[in-house]
């Protein structure tokens, strides 16, 4: 590069600015520059160094560098086109290393344009700290988006956290890039950013693949080694899956499912050794992890993340997480991640005012702040922001082989007036309350996942009546594969919390969900949100004495497993945890020393077994022809009964719930098939801690027409119980 008057006042002024850590083009004054006489002048900025030399590849000294009058700057000359390295004498060590200011830009201009157009894969491939080869030289390329910054420098373990040392190259689209040779895996780093108004901010890397253990906040250079996956068979089956399959999700907060001997969270190795066999033995098909994207505050349960590309360091390394997922797949268990694209916290080291301006968020607090949560809202109208979010989703699915994303707080994304009073929100371009940019982002998210990763689930936590959440994008929908059925959860849980004597007046809370059960592809969630803030566990929310509490919860869970929709149960409910969930302590595993809790756990095991073995319980989960009411109107007795049909013609299943303590004998229910019906599950069984009242295992229909069928069954309905009967072949 021709310097064009390297000794001029302008060049000297530029060099002084760079050396002082002020804005300027570092590559214009540092590194090798061709002089008028054809020789190379090399300038190095090394504050604190005692001496520098230019050496060849074998370490032979080519030239000693002279200290400039400008603090920290050293200069030397070489013949034209001479290859060189740097020998830097620090007070405590001699370092031999390549000159980062001799490297050409590494990111293609086309990739920068793609990022600016909202391409998540391009952002994922190019930003963050990426191991690269410059020729045969191992290096790390640091790249960050900071469009309003005057200057960005990399600081870290490799340069003594000196902000003057490694200013970055400004590229188009507000991206800054610098390749540093021989940076080792595990090195901590941040970006020192000079804002438009001259402030200096120290920020973690938004695209870091690894972070320090909180409360420390630095980013970490992740390993370049590719993980050796052993789940090819699982991945092939997932991609090819087309037929309906059982979906039963165990929702887990990894830091509190179980703790180690020092009351600390288990690492991924220990979780794999303990959690996977447990989930496998209980028969769940998937584990859903509350957010494990890096987050500064454990009390947020992960729902206020800042590192959307990094598994939290609370459980070990990124490779440790990959090992956990791989082990799940070998055990036949899918892994779903709670993923938060609705908002982020305002921690100083994070995304908030990243370059001194509203970079990831809206500048107007009427659009950019969640008052309820004191968090910031992503600006979905900015392509680089949606690229950041899309790239994160792709990272978890492609790099970590995750089987699904449960997208948190979708309702807060869809509505501009969410949680706001009149006058506190900005209408969309058409004057409405819908967040059109968020809608476009969600469609892009679900569309790209569906096309690039067939078989991966996208599940919306959406609590309103927004139409078509799971409808195809081509039909105007959002394109999710599933939506949480919050209405079903609220109605049925409130019903079960009532004293049985008062339930008759609220019978519609059990039946109303079937009015809209097939309008979306629903998951029925009994999640972490139902067991916090002083409510107690699900068992503690049931009415009556201890026996009735257990009976109520057993009946409720069996009703849930028979109801159309896929299933999700938060950890602890499967054995009847009494207390609120506490994110800082283990579940109360000692309860399994008591028979009623073991009985509850056995019931959940048997419910999952029934789900896998009885196609009628899952094949028609999202089809109206998979369900038929038998008894919907017996409010006086708090009884309901329905048929689950297998659309492929398999044996139907009758589910009957009696939600009072009064047993019923000779209770007649019409069924679609004549002949034998076998009682395959009874929550009042002594195996589960019940009174052991039931139907003796097998019943024959009688030619008494009822409920639109020519034959019926004469049943015994146990107290506070749900029974399943399946037609014999």
Swiss-Prot record:
The keyword Transferase applies. Its EC number is 2.4.1.18. Catalyzes the formation of the alpha-1,6-glucosidic linkages in glycogen by scission of a 1,4-alpha-linked oligosaccharide from growing alpha-1,4-glucan chains and the subsequent attachment of the oligosaccharide to the alpha-1,6 position. This is 1,4-alpha-glucan branching enzyme GlgB 2. It catalyses: Transfers a segment of a (1->4)-alpha-D-glucan chain to a primary hydroxy group in a similar glucan chain. One of its GO terms (cellular component) is cytoplasm. It comes from the Bacteria. NCBIfam families: branching_enzym, PRK05402.1, PRK12313.1, PRK12568.1. Pathway: Glycan biosynthesis; glycogen biosynthesis. GO terms for biological process: glycogen biosynthetic process. It comes from Xanthomonas campestris pv. campestris (strain ATCC 33913 / DSM 3586 / NCPPB 528 / LMG 568 / P 25). GO terms for molecular function: 1,4-alpha-glucan branching enzyme activity; cation binding; hydrolase activity, hydrolyzing O-glycosyl compounds. InterPro entries: A-amylase/branching_C, Branching_enzy, GlgB, GlgB_N, GlgB_N_E_set_prok, Glyco_hydro_13_cat_dom, Glyco_hydro_13_N, Glyco_hydro_b. Keywords: Carbohydrate metabolism, Glycogen biosynthesis, Glycogen metabolism, Glycosyltransferase, Transferase. Monomer. Belongs to the glycosyl hydrolase 13 family. GlgB subfamily. It holds the Pfam family Alpha-amylase_C. The active site is at residues 408, 461. CDD domains: AmyAc_Glg_BE (cd11322), E_set_GBE_prok_N (cd02855). The keyword Glycosyltransferase applies.
């Amino acid at each position: 590069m021709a310097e064009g008057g390297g000794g001029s006042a302008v060049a000297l002024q530029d060099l002084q600015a760079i050396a002082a850590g002020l804005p300027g083009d570092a590559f214009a004054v540092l590194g090798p520059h061709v002089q008028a006489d054809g020789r190379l002048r090399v300038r190095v900025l090394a504050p604190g160094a005692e001496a520098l030399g230019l050496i060849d590849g074998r370490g032979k000294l080519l030239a000693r560098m002279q200290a400039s009058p400008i603090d920290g700057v050293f200069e030397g000359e070489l013949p034209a086109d001479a290859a060189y390295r740097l020998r830097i004498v620090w007070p405590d060590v001699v370092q031999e290393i390549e000159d980062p200011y001799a490297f050409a830009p590494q990111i293609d201009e086309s990739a920068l344009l793609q990022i600016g157009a909202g391409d998540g894969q391009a952002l994922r491939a190019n930003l963050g700290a990426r191991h690269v080869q410059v020729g045969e030289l191992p290096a790390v390329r640091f790249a960050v988006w900071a469009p309003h910054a005057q200057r960005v420098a990399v600081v870290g373990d490799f340069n003594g956290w000196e902000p003057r040392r490694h200013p970055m190259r400004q590229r188009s689209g507000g991206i800054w890039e610098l390749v540093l040779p021989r940076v080792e895996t595990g090195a901590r780093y941040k970006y020192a950013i000079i804002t438009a108004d001259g402030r200096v901010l120290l920020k973690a890397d938004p695209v870091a693949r690894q972070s320090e253990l909180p409360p420390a906040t630095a980013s970490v250079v992740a390993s370049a080694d590719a993980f050796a996956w052993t789940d090819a068979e699982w991945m092939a089956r997932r991609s090819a899956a087309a037929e309906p399959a059982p979906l039963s999700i165990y929702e887990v907060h990894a830091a509190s499912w179980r703790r180690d001997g020092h009351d600390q969270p288990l690492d991924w190795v220990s979780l794999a050794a303990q959690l996977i066999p447990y989930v496998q033995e209980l028969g769940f098909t998937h584990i859903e992890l509350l957010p494990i994207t890096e987050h500064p505050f454990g009390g947020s349960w992960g729902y206020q993340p800042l590192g959307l590309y990094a598994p939290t360091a609370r459980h070990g390394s990124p490779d440790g997480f990959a090992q956990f997922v791989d082990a799940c797949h070998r055990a036949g268990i899918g892994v779903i991640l709670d993923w938060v694209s609705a908002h982020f916290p305002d921690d100083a080291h994070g995304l908030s005012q990243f370059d001194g301006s509203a970079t990831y968020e809206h500048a107007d607090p009427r659009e950019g702040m969640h008052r309820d949560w004191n968090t910031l809202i992503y600006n979905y109208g900015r392509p680089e922001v949606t690229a950041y979010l899309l790239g994160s989703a792709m990272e978890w699915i492609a790099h970590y082989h995750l089987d699904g994303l449960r997208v948190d707080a979708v309702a807060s994304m869809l509505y501009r007036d969410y949680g706001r009073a009149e006058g506190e929100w900005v209408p969309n371009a058409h004057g409405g309350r819908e967040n059109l940019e968020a809608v476009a982002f969600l469609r892009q998210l679900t569309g790209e996942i569906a096309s690039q990763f067939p078989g991966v689930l996208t599940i919306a936590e959406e609590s309103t009546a927004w139409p078509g959440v799971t409808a195809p994008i081509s039909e105007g929908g959002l394109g999710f594969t599933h939506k949480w059925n919050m209405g079903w959860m609220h109605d049925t849980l409130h019903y079960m919390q009532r004293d049985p004597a008062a339930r008759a007046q609220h019978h519609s809370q059990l039946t109303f969900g079937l009015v809209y059960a097939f309008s979306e592809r629903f998951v029925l969630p009994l999640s972490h949100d139902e067991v916090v803030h002083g409510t107690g566990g699900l068992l503690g929310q049931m009415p009556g004495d201890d026996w009735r509490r257990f009976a109520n919860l057993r009946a409720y869970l069996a009703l849930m497993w028979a109801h159309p929709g896929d299933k999700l149960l938060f950890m602890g409910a499967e054995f009847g945890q009494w207390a609120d969930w506490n994110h800082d302590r283990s579940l109360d595993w000692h309860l399994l020393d008591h028979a009623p809790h073991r009985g509850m756990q056995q019931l959940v095991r048997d419910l999952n077994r029934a789900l896998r073995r009885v196609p009628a319980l899952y094949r028609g989960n999202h089809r109206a022809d998979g369900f038929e009411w038998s008894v919907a109107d017996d409010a006086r007795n708090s009884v309901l009964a329905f048929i689950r049909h297998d659309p492929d013609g398999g044996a139907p299943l009758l589910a009957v719930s009696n939600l009072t303590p009064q047993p019923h004998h000779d209770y007649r229910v019409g069924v679609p098939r004549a002949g034998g019906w076998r009682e395959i599950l009874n929550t009042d069984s002594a195996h589960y801690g019940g009174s052991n009242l039931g139907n003796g295992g097998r019943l024959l229909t009688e030619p008494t027409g009822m409920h639109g069928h020519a034959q019926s069954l004469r049943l015994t309905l146990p107290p506070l119980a749900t029974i399943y009967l399946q037609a014999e072949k």
